[in-house]
């Protein structure tokens, strides 16, 4: 592998109190950050890359990804997708699975090209996420580091039941499903505890508790026994309480919290993963833009407000908050994670510095990989991005990265295929 020296750049190292550092260069050896040294130090045997005053940051970490879908917006007058039926068709055809896997590889690569060097998937088709992870780890294909969730666990009638999540009807079935998922090589286990906006037909349904507490407890116990952390889809106060009381490690999305729930977060060492992106189009777009039913707009607002209130309350209480954008949901494309950072700053009230830390070293800590990535420090994986302006001043500068490095592999002038009409719609609500 090549060895590089990045010079004439301004370093934002991803640590909690990061500030622009000049006069230093970064030496990359194989897949590691070998050292950070004064710019006048002699170097040899390396390709020297002149950053010409650009900013170099740790690669972003997206904690809530669905590789199974593109994120394209729905078409007008289109019937809602029957995901369970679609999954049945996909799982029966080897040819369709082959084509689908190629698409998923492409989505993973798009994440990388946009500056996301690590993704955490939380609900996918069969074992495809882990297979793609392994192909990347074996350097058969190029992509971000993947922490794979594979298929999740739901209940009959629950969120994405029968598609990207199996259906458990009892605590013992939940244990069986967890063991079956574990046999496919995931990095964690995903549960679907409440309903969601996309499968709700009545106002308030996204937060309806679907998974009984005893099933949540059984699934968490089995996952923990096998060494896996548990992430759970939760969009109501009742769901948050059930999740925390029964062993969930990360509450994906969230809802309004009371003091007792905050106490549970602290006692259990749990954290929320803030995902404003998927709720925003439903909440703020005109129905002529979102092509959603009126009830989805109302539910989108309920969910968006709950996610923001959850993240804000946890942040104010000193509970670490993670960031993910639920990519794959309508309007949430695989190159737009930077928007979630902007929303976290705008709606939750975090400073740009805190937001950058959250999306890099903070997220790495929640994912259990802070010793490997998330900051520009000697010995860590060479996962870096370069942008022309200072993201501490304006987070939207993360929209366009001029260079990406993942595990020492350098990508110059990375390109993504954008959907301009979607970007224009989202830009109007920034």
Predicted feature locations:
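Histidine/acidic-residue-rich catalytic or RNA/ligand-binding cores of hydrolases
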Residues: 72-74, 129, 199-202, 240-246, ...
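Active-site metal-binding motif and surrounding structural segment of the metallo-beta-lactamase
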Residues: 39-57
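Divalent metal-dependent hydrolysis catalytic cores, especially in the metallo-beta-lactamase
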Residues: 92-97, 104-130, 143-154, 186-200, ...
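Active-site microenvironment of metallo-dependent hydrolases
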Residues: 1-24, 29, 39, 90-92, ...
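His/Asp/Glu-enriched, well-ordered alpha-helical/loop segment
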Residues: 225, 229, 294-295, 305-390
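Metal-associated gating/positioning segment near the N- to mid-region
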Residues: 55-135, 214
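Active-site gating loops and adjacent loop-to-helix segments of metal-dependent hydrolytic enzymes
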Residues: 69-100, 150, 155-161, 196-210, ...
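Histidine/acidic residue-rich metal-binding segments in metalloenzymes
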Residues: 131, 172-272, 286-291, 301-321
